Amino acid sequence: MSTRRELLESPYLAAVSGRKPCRVPVWFMRQAGRSLPEYRALRERYSMLAACFEPEVACEITLQPLRRYDVDAAILFSDIVVPLCAAGIDLDIVPDVGPVIGDPVRTATDIHAMKPLEPQAIQPIFQAISLLVAALGDVPLIGFAGAPFTLASYLVEGGPSRNHPRTKAMMLAEPASWHTLMDKLTDLTLGFLLGQIDAGVDAIQVFDSWAGTLSLSDYRQYVLPHSARIFATVAEHGVPMTHFGVGTADLLGAMSAAVRSGEKPGHQAVVGVDWRTSLTDAAARVEPCTALQGNLDPVVLLAGWPAVERVARTVVDDGRRAVVAGAAGHVFNLGHGVLPETDPGVLSELVSFIHSL
């Protein structure tokens, strides 16, 4: 099965599919967000969650960066905790803090009480996708979800955490409860992703933002089976799939194994790489014929244009070497999201520069 739309000229879809793109494709994680004054103006009238659940607002925010930048993909404006909220979890996204859980999930009773995700609860997200598919023309739309481990960390810790102590303690001390929680979150993530695919997204990305806190052994035992189930199921739908985490150099091989689960001919698998690992090194770590995405340090965008140009050129050159070394393709991106203080003019100039190489 092909992607939802026949976007045969898309540089992004070419690169992630192992075909030679007409130019180096580029898009940015958090390209729609606090770096844009038009986003900040709109958010004065809507909370983060309200914006996610209002189809016209989510559509407008998704489109904002495309009016400024000639990026090669749009990514749905949403948040990884949206399906948790839709499933009845008491949470809020607190400015300058992140997701805060009203009643953390820490016992077997808490896990048992979790409700499944009902499709009707996330219809506004799918309605936003329908609006975007109609508006985007030949620009592909990326849908996304949080991976079970990262969602579990928010639920168990009660909010953002540097070291995830309660999460790891449950994982190691109560493995049966842990896997029950992960199974429930895997089902939730699949419901969210498959609904997005049915609504018309052209690719998906799964963010395991906090997986880098784990050892490779723990990742393989407690996380990989659940992430693999997600990708194996999504693979049936034939859309390109990207797996991304921060600080995951030692996990890249296992993460690529997850995204290649249920592999079929023409399987379109991508692994996101942060700035701590070179793309050529990543190419040696991931499974053969996996495309790579990344990996400019977002802080470089604050360092002035000469530094941006120099480091961005290095990333593109490294990506080309990675393809020679066996990567299926390279999509230029940051190694994490656009920082709020980033000048949109620098991003615009960066897109033009990448396309010129």
Swiss-Prot record:
**Xref: CDD domains:** URO-D (cd00717)
Q: Which residues bind substrate?
A: 30-34, 79, 154, 209, 336
Q: Which domain of life is it from?
A: Bacteria
Gene3D superfamilies according to UniProt? 3.20.20.210
Supply the EC number(s): 4.1.1.37
GO BP terms, alphabetized = protoporphyrinogen IX biosynthetic process
Give a short account of what the protein does.
Answer: Catalyzes the decarboxylation of four acetate groups of uroporphyrinogen-III to yield coproporphyrinogen-III.
Q: What is this protein called?
A: Uroporphyrinogen decarboxylase
Q: Which gene encodes it?
A: hemE
